[in-house]
Amino acid sequence: MAVFEKVQDIIVDELGKEKEEVTLETSFEELDADSLDLFQIINDIEDEFDVEVDTEADMKTVADLVKYVENNK
């Protein structure tokens, strides 16, 4: 499974959104994700990919998060 698909699944599970709503271009603001949601998503991604996500990194879209994971796993 590709990184995007795993990240998409985590976001869908955490936010209760439909898969079609979570694309690479989707911003976390569009998904109505608050800071607690983002914390949980990042925590799940760290567990799934065995990476440490820099919370200071500027990640506004799903693509930003996917690129970060791909570059740091």
From Swiss-Prot:
Post-translation changes: 4'-phosphopantetheine is transferred from CoA to a specific serine of apo-ACP by AcpS. This modification is essential for activity because fatty acids are bound in thioester linkage to the sulfhydryl of the prosthetic group.
Superkingdom of the source species: Bacteria
The Carrier domain extends over 1-73
Where does the protein end up? Cytoplasm
Keyword Lipid biosynthesis belongs to the record: yes
Return the GO cellular component terms, semicolon-separated: cytoplasm
Keyword Transmembrane found: no
Q: Residue positions of the PTM O-(pantetheine 4'-phosphoryl)serine? A: 35
Known PROSITE patterns for this protein?
A: CARRIER (PS50075)
Disulfides per UniProt: none
Q: Which UniProt keywords apply?
A: Cytoplasm, Fatty acid biosynthesis, Fatty acid metabolism, Lipid biosynthesis, Lipid metabolism, Phosphopantetheine, Phosphoprotein
The family database entries (SUPFAM superfamilies) matched by this protein are listed as: ACP-like
MF terms (GO), sorted A to Z: acyl carrier activity
State which pathway it belongs to: Lipid metabolism; fatty acid biosynthesis
Into which family does the record put it?
Answer: Belongs to the acyl carrier protein (ACP) family.
NCBIfam families named among the record's database cross-references = PRK00982.1-4
Question: What role is this protein assigned?
Answer: Carrier of the growing fatty acid chain in fatty acid biosynthesis.
What is this protein's record name?
Acyl carrier protein
The organism that produces this protein has a lineage beginning with: Bacteria, Bacillati, Bacillota, Bacilli, Lactobacillales
**Could you tell me the gene encoding this protein?**
acpP
